[in-house]
C-alpha cells in the first residue's frame, strides 16, 4: 500500500515518531522528517512492518531525498527524571529543532503531544502505517536508535543489546538479575526494578 500525505496542499508537512519508548535500557530517539510532496517509494511503511535490511536500505534514500530531517535523543537519566511520556515529547521537540526549515504542520504518531512553538499538529494513532512522513520518521528513529544500542553493547555485552536493543526480553531481564543494572538502564522502569530485585528462596 502506498502511503499518502495528510493533506494534499503546499504546506511543509513534518512527520514525527519515536523509538525505544518501551525499552528498559538506552535512550529514546525521535525523528522529524519533511518529505517532498511527490516523494514515493514502494518499500516505505511503518518501520515495525519492515525487515532490518529494508529499514537500512530506506534510510539513505529518505535522508538524500527529504527536504529536511532531524534526530532527537533523550537519555535514560532524563527519562527517569521526567517520565517516558514527557521524554518522548522532548525527543520529538529536539528532532524538530534540528530541521533546516520550520514545519508548517506536524503529524505525530500517537494520541498525545506537547505542542511545539504553536505549529499546528495532528495526533494520529497508527500514523506510521498511514502517512509517509511519519513512516519515514519511524525508520530513521528506529535505525539510529538501533545503532546506538549496538555501540553501547560493545561495553556491556552481557545484556545482549545487539539482539534485544534494550527491550524487556527474558534474556535481558535475566542478565539484569545476574549482573545488576548498567549506567544505561532506566531505573524507574518496573522491568528494571523487578529484575534487579534479589529473589528469595
From Swiss-Prot:
It holds the Pfam family RNase_HII. It comes from Porphyromonas gingivalis (strain ATCC BAA-308 / W83). Endonuclease that specifically degrades the RNA of RNA-DNA hybrids. The keyword Transmembrane helix does not apply. Belongs to the RNase HII family. GO terms for molecular function: manganese ion binding; RNA binding; RNA-DNA hybrid ribonuclease activity. One of its GO terms (cellular component) is cytoplasm. Its EC number is 3.1.26.4. This is Ribonuclease HII. It comes from the Bacteria.
Amino acid at each position: 500500500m502506498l502511503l499518502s500525505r495528510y493533506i494534499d496542499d503546499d504546506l511543509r508537512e513534518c512527520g514525527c515518531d519515536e523509538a525505544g519508548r518501551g525499552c528498559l535500557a538506552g535512550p529514546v530517539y525521535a525523528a522529524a522528517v519533511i518529505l517532498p510532496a511527490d516523494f514515493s517509494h514502494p518499500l516505505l511503511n511503518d518501520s515495525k512492518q519492515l525487515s532490518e535490511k529494508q529499514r537500512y536500505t530506506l534510510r539513505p534514500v529518505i535522508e538524500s531525498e527529504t527536504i529536511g530531517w532531524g534526530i532527537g535523543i533523550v537519555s535514560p537519566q532524563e527519562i527517569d527524571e521526567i517520565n517516558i511520556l514527557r521524554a518522548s515529547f522532548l525527543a520529538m521537540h529536539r528532532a524538530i529543532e534540528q530541521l533546516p526549515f520550520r514545519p508548517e504542520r506536524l503529524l505525530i504518531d500517537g494520541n498525545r503531544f506537547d505542542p511545539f512553538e504553536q505549529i499546528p499538529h495532528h495526533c494520529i494513532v497508527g500514523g506510521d502505517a498511514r502517512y509517509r512522513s511519519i513512516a519515514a520518521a519511524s525508520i530513521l528513529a528506529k535505525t539510529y536508535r538501533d545503532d546506538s544500542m549496538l555501540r553501547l553493547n560493545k561495553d556491556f555485552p552481557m545484556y545482549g543489546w545487539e539482539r534485544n536493543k534494550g527491550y524487556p526480553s527474558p534474556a535481558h531481564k535475566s542478565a539484569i538479575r545476574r549482573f545488576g543494572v548498567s549506567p544505561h538502564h532506566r531505573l524507574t522502569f518496573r522491568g528494571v526494578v523487578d529484575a534487579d530485585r534479589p529473589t528469595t528462596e
